[in-house]
Curated annotation (Swiss-Prot):
It is found in: Cytoplasm. It comes from Streptomyces griseus subsp. griseus (strain JCM 4626 / CBS 651.72 / NBRC 13350 / KCC S-0626 / ISP 5235). It catalyses: uroporphyrinogen III + 4 H(+) = coproporphyrinogen III + 4 CO2. This is Uroporphyrinogen decarboxylase. NCBIfam families: hemE (TIGR01464). InterPro entries: UROD/MetE-like_sf, Uroporphyrinogen_deCO2ase_HemE, Uroporphyrinogen_deCOase. Substrate binds at R48, Q49, A50, G51, R52, D97, Y172, S227, H341. Residues 1-17 have a biased composition (Polar residues). GO terms for molecular function: uroporphyrinogen decarboxylase activity. One of its GO terms (biological process) is protoporphyrinogen IX biosynthetic process. Catalyzes the decarboxylation of four acetate groups of uroporphyrinogen-III to yield coproporphyrinogen-III. GO terms for cellular component: cytosol.
Length: 365
């Protein structure tokens, strides 16, 4: 393998620069926790830490549509760095949206404020699958450029790449947008299981390719978000979802970076989500971490899981609930502190800053 080659055979960031990133971040508390190694303190980061809770985010995003902002490397880098500067979190997460790879391959979609992703022409027939072409690095040059900027700025702080999981992307594509009950999604899954299997398999290939671009540009870990999969029963997850999610994790396995799997309302699915191949399983606030560890089984670190709404309570109450999370995590093989879902837009950013400091202080070894 030449200096510029990657496991996928694509020409990308030089191996020397990637080696420098890996060396700088290797002993970070976040990556050590992902590997279930001893840590100087429990690492902390937050889903949606870069976003509307920060006044500096609102300022730089003013007048710029969400999808447009995801394709502006300097803006992406600035937004990604903002919570690292403000909160002193232990990891940055790349600022983007889960539908970016779909937009990049030509799917006609938009993110409508107050609604979410809206698909102009939903995917509902076998003929529609032809619109889901391969994703290449050339489709997302802004990702490679932004991550190059970020790794230069972040130094020893790891950058997490991310993507939407096949089920959640499929739900958006089939429904045409967000859905409370996922009627059309489930109708395809149950009524035409082969079409469904082909759809999520195709999305697994696209998602895997998107994560590879991020890793090859310098991401030190990746997280697969399955926002809607909590709508499924375990048997349906095993049959109709797990193979596609596993395909994504298998695609990035050769890179050796930690792989995180997170879904909302997935307490009954935690063991299956671990089976899909993640090194770290994210847990929402509904299941205590010690019980989550029992469900997931050995050999996995856990991430979570403070209820985001707790941050609206007075500081003593936040600290009490935080101690409950830390106590439940006391016997885990590896623990990354996070919220059980994303940061809410109207959350006081100072509460997040205090939370990071409190977790670091309480868990200092």
């Amino acid at each position: 393998m030449s200096a510029n080659d990657s496991p996928s055979g694509q020409q990308t960031t030089t191996s020397a620069s990637l080696d420098a990133v890996r060396h700088a971040t290797h002993d970070s508390a976040f990556l050590r926790a992902c590997r279930r190694e001893p840590v100087p303190h429990t690492p902390v980061w937050f889903m949606r830490q870069a976003g509307r809770s920060l006044p500096e985010y609102l300022k730089v995003r003013e007048g710029i549509a969400m999808l447009d902002s995801c394709m502006m490397p300097e803006l992406v880098a600035e937004i990604t760095l903002q919570p690292v500067r403000r909160h002193k979190v232990d990891a940055a997460i790349y600022f983007s949206d889960i539908v970016v790879p779909l937009k990049a391959i030509g799917i006609d979609l938009d993110i409508k404020p107050g609604v979410g992703p809206v698909i102009a022409e939903p995917i509902r027939t076998r003929a529609d699958l032809a619109r889901l072409r391969d994703l290449t690095p050339e489709d997302v040059p802004y990702v490679t450029e932004a991550i190059g900027m970020l790794t230069a700025e972040l130094g020893a702080t790891p950058l997490i790449g991310f993507a939407g999981a096949p089920f959640t992307l499929a739900s958006y594509l089939v429904e045409g947008g967000p859905s409370r009950n996922h009627e059309r999604t489930k109708a395809m899954m149950y009524g035409d299981p082969q079409l469904w299997a082909d759809l999520v398999d195709r999305l697994a290939e696209i998602t895997g390719a998107f994560l590879k671009v991020q890793i090859e540009a310098g991401a030190s870990a990746v997280q697969l978000f399955d926002s809607w999969v909590g709508a499924l029963a375990p048997a349906d997850y095993r049959r109709a979802v797990l193979p596609a999610s596993a395909k994504v994790f298998d695609a990035v396995a050769p890179y050796g970076v930690p792989r995180i799997h997170f879904g909302v309302g997935t307490g009954e699915l935690l063991g299956l989500m671990g089976e899909a191949g993640a090194d770290v399983v994210g847990v929402d606030w509904r299941v205590p971490l010690n019980e989550a560890a029992r469900r997931v089984g050995p050999g996995k670190a856990l991430q979570g899981n403070l209820d985001p709404a707790v941050l609206f309570a007075p500081t003593p109450a936040v600290e009490e609930k935080t101690r409950e999370v830390l106590d439940a995590a006391a016997g885990l093989e590896g623990h990354i502190f996070n919220l059980g879902h994303g940061v809410m837009p109207n959350m006081d950013p100072d509460a997040l800053t205090r939370l990071v400091g409190y977790v670091h202080e309480q868990t200092a070894r």
